[in-house]
Amino acid sequence: MKTLLLSLLITFGLVFQAQAQEALSVTPEETWKMTQEQGDEILFIDVRDPVEIMFIGFTDAVDANIPFKLVDRARFSEEKAKFAMDTNPDFVADVDKALEAKGLDRDALIITMCRSGSSRGKPSAEYLLERGFTNVKYIDHGFQGSSAKEGRLKGLRAVNGWQNSGLPWSMDINPDKIYRP
């Protein structure tokens, strides 16, 4: 009986831990509303590499650009036809600094945004949760959104995401918010 009870407690603990570490998504519109209504109480970060922002666009609604992954231009994969991307070793420390600058702590709501939401948005949110931050979400479909499956825009990132939701963005980058190592 003790073994069964112990097994159940361990299983429940592992399930609870797994659930606690899965970041939840929010829409661009929900994020915009939160930044307007409670902007002093949340930290909204763009986790894209700054060069990517330079070519795709930026929203000044974010508090800061803190890349989760940084492009390593010295390592190129011929097979994938892409440069390597490594986790920014200063990511957590930079998020802590951004929270401190707003007078917030690790219990404050943090929202991350990447290009599509899945490759760095959700992983960066989960990375923060695994490191002691308690309330982290990511923007579903990110800044640029998903590719259209059909029609004249087929293959272009013209569906959902911050850019396609009618929210403010620009090709201009706020120099006070862009990441500089």
Q: Predicted regions span which residues?
A:
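Positively charged n-region of N-terminal signal peptides that target proteins for export
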Residues: M1-L5
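Bacterial N-terminal signal peptides
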Residues: S7-V15
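Rhodanese-like catalytic fold shared by cysteine-dependent sulfurtransferases
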Residues: A18-D40, M54-L109, S119-P181
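Short hydrophobic beta-strand that contains or immediately precedes a catalytic carboxylate
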Residues: L43-R48, I66
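Glycine-rich nucleotide phosphate-binding loop and flanking beta-alpha elements
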Residues: V51
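Short, surface-exposed ligand- or partner-binding patches at beta-edge/loop junctions that are enriched
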Residues: M113
